[in-house]
A protein has these predicted regions:
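Active-site- and interface-proximal helix/loop "cap" or "latch" segments in soluble metabolic
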Residues: 4-12, 17, 21-80
């Protein structure tokens, strides 16, 4: 799935889900080290667990963050 982010430095997040587990998570743009680290940490994680852990994280004064945007993308995926 591809998700266009809003309000953060990254422009897009792509990921796949196999057996309710996250795989191939990639961010386009944003802080390279942070987004690579996040992608590696959540590889193989259950999507519901990822949503619980990432939902609502802020980045400085912004009301969202790259992790929060990923949680939103996963929620959208589940609604399909």
């Amino acid at each position: 799935m591809r998700y266009k982010t809003q309000g953060v430095c990254s422009r897009e997040i792509s990921f796949e889900v196999k057996d309710n587990k996250l795989t191939n998570v990639q961010f386009v743009g944003g802080g390279s080290g942070n987004t690579q680290g996040l992608s590696r940490l959540i590889e193989g994680m259950d999507i519901d667990e990822a949503i619980t852990r990432l939902d609502g994280i802020h980045c400085g004064p912004r009301p969202t963050s790259c992790p929060d945007q990923l949680a939103r993308a996963l929620k959208q995926y589940k609604e399909q």
